[in-house]
C-alpha cells in the first residue's frame, strides 16, 4: 500500500481521470419497473422532473474529470441513444473527449445479445483497447447518486489494487439483492458472494451487510486479460459479480472502496445517497423526495451539476380558470412547458409539457412528459407514463380494487398508468 501526500492527491485527482475510460452498462431492461420499461431501457427512464437516469453516471464522469466514456447498450436502446445524441454531443474529439455508443456486436456464434455484464465489455474489447487507457471504470447506468470517481481512482492506486469495488452498508434484509463482501483491516476483499440467500453481516454491525454497488475500477491490462480468460470458460456466466469479482478476490487482488469517501454531498453530515430505483415504489419515492423541503439528494449543487438534454421550453404557468379557481402547487417540482389551470398540485413531480386542466387534485404523483389531465380528475400515489391522456373525471389512487383492475398496482399501493392501459379501457390517447 502506497502512502500519498496531500499534493500527490491533488496531482492524481487531475491525472488519473485523464488516464481512464468509463464504461457505462446501460443495456438493462429493468423488469421490476413493469410497463414503465416496455419501450425504453431502464437507464433511459425519466427522473427528477427533467433528467434521465443515465444522466447521473454521465455527469459524475464529467465532474470527476473523466471525459472518455463508452455507453454499452442493448435492450430497447433507441430512446437512450437519441437522448445521448441530443444531450451529450458537446465533446471535442480533437481533445480526446467522447461518448461512444457501443451496441451489442452479436459476434458470438449462436448468441444474439450480451451473455452477462462482463460479456458486454468483452464483445467491445477491440474498440475499448483503442482508447489506450491505463484504468477502466465500470459503471451501472441505472442508479441515482453523486460520486467523485477521481477519489476512487486515487484509492485504487494508493492501495496497489488491480480491482477496486465501491461498497456501502445495506440492511441485511435487503442484501440478497447485491453482491456481499467481507474485508480485512486494509479493505482487501477476503470473501465475495453474489446475491446470497443468507447474507453475512458486518462484524461491527450485525444488522447490515457490506454490499457491492456494481462500480469497479480496474487496471486496464489486467481487466483485458481477465475478460479473455473468462470468455474461454464455458462454465462461466460471464458476469462481473458472479464470476470475475470472486475470482479476483480469491487471487487476493481486489480491494473495497467505501462509498462515503467519494460520495458528493452538500451536507457532510448527511447519509451518503445511492438509490437503485429498480422497483415502482423506489422510483416513485425517490422522485417525490426531490420535492420535499430538504431532499436527501441535492440537485441544486452548482459544484456538481447534473447535465441533461434541455429543450427550449417556456416557463411553467399557473393560471386562474374562468370559474375563478387558481392553479396552485405546494412542495412540488414543475418543469418547463407545464400549464396548471385552476387545479391543486401537492407533493408531486411534473415533467415537461404536462397540462393539468381545471378542478383537478394531484397529490403525491409523478407525471412524465406530455401528460394531459382532463378536468375534475383526482390523482394520488401514482406514476403516469409519458404522453398519457387522462380522461375527464378519472380517479386514480383512491380505490385499490378499481386501480388493480384497470392499471398496475404494486403491493405498496403505487399505481402505474400507461397509454396502452388507458386504450384497453376505451380512452383515446390522441388529442
UniProtKB/Swiss-Prot annotation:
Keyword list, A-Z: Allosteric enzyme, ATP-binding, Carbohydrate metabolism, Glycogen biosynthesis, Glycogen metabolism, Nucleotide-binding, Nucleotidyltransferase, Transferase
Pathway where it operates: Glycan biosynthesis; glycogen biosynthesis
Coiled-coil region(s): none
Binding site for beta-D-fructose 1,6-bisphosphate: 39, 419-423, 429-431
Record bears the keyword ATP-binding: yes
Its EC number(s): 2.7.7.27
One Gene Ontology molecular-function label: ATP binding
Annotated positions binding alpha-D-glucose 1-phosphate: 114, 179, 194-195, 212
Reaction equations catalysed: alpha-D-glucose 1-phosphate + ATP + H(+) = ADP-alpha-D-glucose + diphosphate
CDD domains referenced in this protein's UniProt entry, alphabetically: ADP_Glucose_PP, LbH_G1P_AT_C
Enzyme class label: transferase
GO biological process: glycogen biosynthetic process
Keyword Ligase found: no
Positions annotated to bind AMP: 40, 46, 52, 130, 370, 386
Site (Could play a key role in the communication between the regulatory and the substrate sites): residue numbering on this chain: 74, 113
Gene3D superfamilies, alphabetized: Hexapeptide repeat proteins, Spore Coat Polysaccharide Biosynthesis Protein SpsA, Chain A
Modes of activity regulation: Allosterically activated by fructose-1,6-bisphosphate (F16BP) and inhibited by AMP.
Subunit composition and interactions: Homotetramer.
Family note: Belongs to the bacterial/plant glucose-1-phosphate adenylyltransferase family.
Function: Involved in the biosynthesis of ADP-glucose, a building block required for the elongation reactions to produce glycogen. Catalyzes the reaction between ATP and alpha-D-glucose 1-phosphate (G1P) to produce pyrophosphate and ADP-Glc.
Protein name according to UniProt: Glucose-1-phosphate adenylyltransferase
Originating gene: glgC
